[in-house]
């Protein structure tokens, strides 16, 4: 049961009834029904009176007064209040919360599982790091974000495909091949000098050694470029897959930019046939990049027709296709595979791609497909108060493997979602190892383990639980938080914001730890009361529900909930 959806539905039905009775002239849509931030304002508030007042051209307080009288008879409602400038606050009957508690324990970890996706196909593309080396910690943030988002969408009924786009074409790959060829010669015993601009990373040595072992001295840089290329990319992609596996991330599909190059002309022709490709001139760009700029006639895509800032070039000065042209081919391929709902995770430095990607998807699909681009910001990592550099070409960068091996997979996955994806994240090694409230995953896992400890230590023979015995403020507060779980799941899924799950689990854990703490000073507040087995049974019923909700939340992270702390 999503109590907020239920009340929202009751309000909508009542508005239709009032319209039929001639009390109001219009119905309201897109009004809010949420728990208030201040507990003194009731269990649920709505702004429906203010939304309706705009259409009715009346004072919101006057409308709120009319609606409050109509909402009071709802079976679920105990009390209705009006607050300036027109909010309606509702206190629900205690039986509502006890009923939700029963439902949680009936559904167990399935409480919060929804079907808003109706098995629609959705493609979630994430990581898609250039295959030039192991994943660094910034890639790890994108990997966790994409993977958990995919899990969240599955939980609400979408048919999700997790995809990795291999950027295996372009100048960076050429540089990589030259770097590996030097390591190959080094493996054969030659002295090498790594010139500026090449990749000096130690991770390339085993690849060079592998080439030497397989081909001996027969490889030549020019003649055997394709052999070196395929071996190198295969080796690095395997390395990336191993790193992602350590993070608990596995993609369903890997798509190669290099293999899609034949689709560029096909996709550009489709746009051209729609009158969306033309030869023209771009205005001089602003900023440093304009210093060497010269005006020239270019092949352009009319992306401004779809809300972009400028039209986009499809060919470079040398006649080769731009990276954007490759993007067009890739998204044409996605649409051809039946994906009309696409999500792409990119680093925040790719913010300029958002409008052009939306433009091309709209153009290729005649507005039938949609794409949502989610940007993740950087991760600041500090070691001995010194920032760790993360440049592949310098050879000195913190890898995802380094972090997972240092703190563990579950900690890494959870911490990566303790901030909204577009906010900078500080990863503090010391804090994530602490067994304290400052360590978010420990705090949540400790709540789950504490719940199971209580259930293990409770008397084996307990009467049937009667939730109506749960009446204290702390007990009801925790039940009300647990009741929010379906709403949290739905909002997080609709907004593509999995960090909301993290925030919610921390809220649940805090409410439980606080409630447990009351028993230190008040023996009657302890969960286990040897002289009151009926109340003990009711409190164990609450503890059981809490454990189900935490386990349900952690399952979205693919994190095993702990029943005991080490």
UniProtKB/Swiss-Prot annotation:
Locate the motif 'HIGH' region. Answer: 129-139
Q: Which Gene3D superfamilies match?
A: Arginyl tRNA synthetase N-terminal domain, HUPs, Isoleucyl-tRNA Synthetase, Domain 1
Q: Lipoprotein: is it a keyword of this entry?
A: no
Q: What Enzyme Commission number(s) apply to this enzyme? A: 6.1.1.19
The Gene Ontology terms for molecular function here are: arginine-tRNA ligase activity; ATP binding
Signal peptide stretch: none
Q: Report the domain of life of the source organism.
A: Bacteria
Q: Which InterPro entries match?
A: aa-tRNA-synth_I_CS, Arg-tRNA-ligase, Arg-tRNA-synth_N, Arg-tRNA-synth_N_sf, ArgRS_core, DALR_anticod-bd, Rossmann-like_a/b/a_fold, tRNAsynth_Ia_anticodon-bd
Tell me which SMART domains the record gives: Arg_tRNA_synt_N, DALR_1
Question: What cellular component GO annotations does this protein have?
Answer: cytoplasm
Task: Alphabetically list the UniProt keywords.
Answer: Aminoacyl-tRNA synthetase, ATP-binding, Cytoplasm, Ligase, Nucleotide-binding, Protein biosynthesis
> Among the record's GO biological process terms, what is one?
arginyl-tRNA aminoacylation
Swiss-Prot/TrEMBL catalytic activity: tRNA(Arg) + L-arginine + ATP = L-arginyl-tRNA(Arg) + AMP + diphosphate
Location in the cell reads: Cytoplasm
Q: How does it assemble?
A: Monomer.
Family listed: Belongs to the class-I aminoacyl-tRNA synthetase family.
The protein in question is named Arginine--tRNA ligase
Look up and give the organism this protein is from: Wolbachia pipientis subsp. Culex pipiens (strain wPip)
Q: Which gene carries the instructions for this protein?
A: argS
């Amino acid at each position: 049961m999503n109590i907020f959806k239920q009340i929202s539905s009751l309000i909508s039905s009542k508005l239709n009834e009032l319209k039929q009775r001639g009390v109001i002239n219009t119905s309201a849509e897109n009004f809010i029904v949420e728990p208030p931030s201040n507990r003194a304002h009731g269990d649920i508030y709505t702004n429906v009176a203010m939304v309706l007042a705009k259409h009715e051209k009346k004072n919101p307080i006057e409308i709120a007064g009319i609606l409050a009288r109509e909402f009071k008879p709802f079976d679920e409602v105990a009390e209705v209040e009006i607050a300036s400038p027109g909010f309606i606050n509702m206190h629900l009957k205690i039986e509502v919360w006890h009923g939700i508690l029963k439902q949680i324990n009936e559904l167990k970890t399935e409480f919060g599982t929804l079907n808003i996706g109706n098995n629609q196909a959705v493609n979630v593309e994430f990581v898609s790091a250039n295959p030039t080396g192991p994943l660094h910690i910034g890639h790890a943030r994108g990997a966790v974000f994409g993977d958990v988002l995919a899990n969240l969408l599955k939980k609400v009924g979408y048919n999700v495909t997790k995809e990795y786009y291999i950027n295996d074409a372009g100048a960076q790959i050429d540089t990589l091949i030259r770097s590996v060829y030097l390591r190959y010669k080094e493996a054969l015993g030659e002295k090498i000098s790594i010139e500026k601009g090449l990749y000096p990373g130690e991770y390339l040595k085993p690849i060079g050694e592998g080439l030497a072992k397989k081909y001996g001295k027969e490889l030549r840089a020019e003649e055997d470029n394709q052999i070196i290329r395929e071996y190198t990319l295969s080796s690095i992609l395997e390395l990336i897959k191993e790193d992602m596996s350590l993070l608990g991330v596995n993609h369903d599909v890997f798509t190669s930019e290099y293999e899609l190059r034949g689709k560029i002309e096909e996709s550009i022709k489709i746009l051209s046939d729609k009158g969306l490709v033309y030869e023209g001139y771009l205005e001089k760009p602003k900023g440093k990049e304009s210093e060497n700029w010269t005006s020239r006639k270019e092949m352009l895509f009319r992306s401004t027709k779809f809300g972009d800032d400028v039209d986009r070039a499809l060919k470079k000065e040398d006649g080769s296709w731009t990276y954007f042209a490759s993007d067009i081919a890739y998204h044409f391929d996605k649409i051809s595979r039946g994906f009309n709902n696409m999500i792409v995770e990119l680093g925040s430095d790719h913010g300029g791609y958002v409008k052009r990607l939306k433009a091309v998807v709209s153009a290729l699909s005649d507005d039938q497909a949609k794409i949502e681009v989610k940007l993740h910001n950087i991760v600041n990592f500090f070691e001995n108060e010194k920032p760790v550099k993360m440049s592949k070409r310098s050879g000195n960068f913190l890898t995802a493997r380094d972090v997972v091996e240092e703190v563990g997979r579950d900690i890494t996955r959870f911490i990566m979602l303790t901030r909204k994806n577009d906010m900078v994240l500080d990863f503090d090694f010391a804090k994530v190892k602490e067994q304290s409230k400052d360590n978010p995953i420990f705090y949540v896992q400790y709540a789950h383990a504490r719940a199971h400890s209580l259930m293990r230590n409770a008397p084996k023979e307990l009467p049937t639980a009667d939730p109506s015995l749960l009446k204290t403020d702390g007990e009801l507060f925790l039940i009300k938080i647990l009741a929010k779980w379906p709403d949290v799941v739905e909002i997080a899924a609709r907004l593509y914001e999995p960090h909301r799950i993290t925030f919610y689990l921390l809220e649940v854990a805090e409410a439980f730890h606080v409630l447990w703490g009351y028993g230190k000073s008040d023996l009657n507040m302890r969960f286990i009361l040897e002289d009151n087995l009926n109340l003990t049974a009711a409190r164990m019923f609450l503890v059981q529900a809490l454990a189900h909700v935490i386990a349900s939340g952690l399952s979205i992270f693919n994190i095993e909930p702990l029943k005991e702390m080490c």
